[in-house]
């Protein structure tokens, strides 16, 4: 058996017969020795040297038998035989990964003509994608010209300058002439100087009275001009060395090359939520845009937008599909179409995931549904993320205060910052809105040394907005993951950048990436508390407050809140009383803690038995005066979250009407306490007096505070917080001396003067509507306040604005005849005084002004919840 296997193996290895001589190695040696004769110089060469000789051999100049039409190297001849090149154009918008560069059978990569390539407009990341377009039929001359372009750029052309025929010379001359006539559409590079020249030409075109360009186009270009032409603090500009080359060419193309319709559509898409939009609906929504289909084609060709060929996922299509399209698609796949939109989306999504192909995947089913949805939707477009990011950078540099992501936290209803900014600029241009900021503003935000710093700040803002959005939607795990990303950004930040950010003034640090990332870490502790992971929350809070030295100089306004939350977690949730007492003693040494948080920490310390016996309270305030009144209440829930509804009698109609608890109290004091005027202002009347007396100090625009005005749209200087007093100390003190010594009539005249000059202006301090009778109403209020009390209150605002800008009592009441004034904090059922309110009530009481807490109880016998 073994012998048979061995014979079988030998049979397989053994050759079938004798080797043919032509296939033998001897035949190869003989072929090499014979060589080959050159047909041009008739010289014999070995096969090894024949090919290289043919690349250099020329016909003699006096040869009468041969006329050379054109000469090519071997590689050039291969390109000739390959046919016309594949031209990369603008008709396709798919990514390189989906249309890879093709190769010939010779494995030579096709080289596209430079003049036929329109490069992608990259985003801030600088990533450029090429897109492939099917080539059209070319005649012989075009083929020859295309190949000549390739030859001219090849190494062989440079190293071996062959004699050209007249045909080739003429072709090169035509190519040079065409190059001298630059096609602006194919312009691939630009400078900031060229962008400014293009802006000047645009301004000349739209300056005529017959021009009707939309305001948002003119304002967008105005923003661009101001950003790239305004001098920074250090004397430099946002010039060519700051921007990427792709950024500058995008600016140039937007201003110079795009048509009016394309500009309008692009800006409209930019200021809207970045998503897919149906072209038909865009036509209906923006009828003022001329030839919107041509605009779409132009923008797609210029790589500013994507068409629906870039819509790759089912979720993208489902998100923009209306009920009609969804029903038609569900009917096509034999699903139940008698549902609402959300149910139809879920049904299609579930169907796509449940139907497996023969290979076990669901991709083919999803693609079929996606294809059907695209057919139903028709043409769709989406502005490219790179363009959106770049223009957000422009708007951020122009007005960092308005585009600050902290505004989303303070006002969650703020959904479209950039659209609001454009409309606000229109209002300023029309004169319907006035701000105290200089217009035009001579200074621009200068916190970003390079493009990467600006990009990091943009990332941090987007990250914070995403965290807040996920938290509001209840997606706490996703929000926590984003907060962890923020912490990693801080850890990976270079030491040079950290030192630079720390060298900035406090009001400038707010517009840097490390400040926003630090605030995102604060969101993480809030998320963990909502998830009842108190131990992890404490670890994050300790890192923010104690451990991580790199972030101690940021989010100073929030440090007191973080201390209070950490102590609450240790005391109430984790029951670690000793650790809480230890942390309290560390917290009291933190100079950045505001007075209101300090009082909260003090209250907790007084309740802890573990605190040392010699503990000294840092703040000593008395208890405010209390008053209790009753009012009629209807306990009824109408779906708005309120249960207790206060009712009062309207004397004009003799009907019972619903009102707020503050209105109940205000009426009580006007009818029963001897006051003739009262407003529910929460301190705005006092802030108005502060703004009137110190207007030229707070809103000064001289060189010493010039860096606090970064845009024409600011309603206050950017340092109306920590450094307000320190930067203007001398001027504040001079004004306080004047208030102490000036005659009553002179001060009243000053109030009237400032009121007449500025009452149409919108600024952070003055609430003109609180005095409906104008300046005289304000003067009558001033006459009721004792001068020493007024100076004490205004000094507290000036010296510690960050600590005292809020917390004022709800009601301010006065009587010009009796010269009496009072402040009242109103508390309904179940309400408690905050530490800010306790502090202000104590300040008013100490200054001699009547300050009370008024509790409103139910008229009926039922206790209110």
Curated annotation (Swiss-Prot):
The reaction(s) this protein catalyses: Hydrolytically removes 5'-nucleotides successively from the 3'-hydroxy termini of 3'-hydroxy-terminated oligonucleotides
Cofactor binding mode and count: Binds 2 magnesium or manganese ions per subunit.
Biased composition, class Basic and acidic residues, residue ranges: 93-112, 174-187
Necessary cofactors: Mn(2+); Mg(2+)
Disruption phenotype: No visible phenotype in normal conditions. Strong increase of embryonic lethality following cisplatin, nitrogen mustard or mitomycin-C (MMC) treatment.
BP term (GO), one: interstrand cross-link repair
Signal sequence interval, chain numbering: none
PROSITE patterns for this protein: ZF_UBZ4
InterPro entries associated with the record: Fan1-like (IPR033315), FAN1-like_euk (IPR049132), FAN1-like_TPR (IPR049126), FAN1-like_WH (IPR049125), Rad18_UBZ4 (IPR006642), tRNA_endonuc-like_dom_sf (IPR011856), VRR_NUC (IPR014883)
Residue stretches making up the VRR-NUC domain: 744-857
Binding locations of Mn(2+) 1: 810, 825-826
Protein keywords: DNA damage, DNA repair, Hydrolase, Magnesium, Manganese, Metal-binding, Nuclease, Nucleus, Zinc, Zinc-finger
Zinc finger (UBZ4-type): 35-62
Subcellular location, principal: nucleus
Region (Disordered): 90-140, 162-187
Residues annotated for Zn(2+) binding in this entry: 38, 41, 53, 57
Entry similarity comment: Belongs to the FAN1 family.
Role, per record: Nuclease required for the repair of DNA interstrand cross-links (ICL). Acts as a 5'-3' exonuclease that anchors at a cut end of DNA and cleaves DNA successively at every third nucleotide, allowing to excise an ICL from one strand through flanking incisions.
Name of the protein in question: Fanconi-associated nuclease 1 homolog
Species this chain originates from: Caenorhabditis elegans
